[in-house]
Amino acid sequence: MSINPNETTTGFNQLLETPDTMELAQRIIENYHNQSIQQILEINGKYMSDADRERVSNGVDSIKAVEHTPEKGYTGFYLLNNGRSSIEVSAINQLQMERSTKHETNHFASTNREIIVPQPDRRGYNVYQTVGTRQASWFHSNETGKDSEFSSKGRGLNEGLTTMYTNQQLMEISKEKGETAERQGIYGHATEICTQLENILGKDTLKEAYYGGNMQNLESKVNSIAGDKSFENLREC
């Protein structure tokens, strides 16, 4: 993939500046999202189904730059809801916006599945959702419009893989960007475990699970090495 000449050491300090307007921030994250999709498909498209490659190539349904709110504790957010995908990224400096956009774009590019099971007796429906290696479920009430009975597993492994792939992709663009992202230590413990897991199992097994949805192979390999039920513990790292 091509490298923007502004993304050299000379222009690196410019990436630490905050955009003057939200309109500019919006254009910046849209550009980073499109660049990320191109890079992810080039590197990892082979692990995806034809339908997923098409979904990813079309981009997320909604992407928005938002004012940064430190008390939220995050700079980016990905949501899959009723088959619609959306990303929000805090308008901070361009370096952080690129990392956050790439991180959330990886969530979008990972396995995204949503099964809705009607529950007419309860006047609502159950949702069973997979994003990457994280699985979640909940009940939605048509009467109140509210969700309840939340259940989730695999968030630790999912965030560790997402951060590891984000850092690797930034390193492909620029060593300086990759090392800066690594120093931030985002999901540090989970990322370190995923890095060790990649060294043991190889890249393909993890990427087939994350981008391709083949969790059974990953679970089987982990359990064969570490013992039965080890994968369930690993998922919550």
Which stretches of residues belong to each language-model region?
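Substrate-binding clefts and substrate-entry loops adjacent to catalytic sites
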Residues: 144-149, 171-182
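Pan-zinc metallopeptidase signature
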Residues: 13, 179-237
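Active-site recognition of the HExxH zinc-binding catalytic motif
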Residues: 99-116, 159, 163, 167
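Post-HEXXH active-site segment of zinc metalloproteases
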Residues: 95, 111-160
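Non-Sec secretion/translocation targeting segments of pathogen effectors
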Residues: 1-10, 162
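Hydrophobic (often cysteine-bearing) scaffold residues that line and stabilize catalytic clefts
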Residues: 21, 25, 29, 98, ...
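Auxiliary, metal-adjacent structural segments of Zn-dependent hydrolase domains
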Residues: 14-95, 113-130
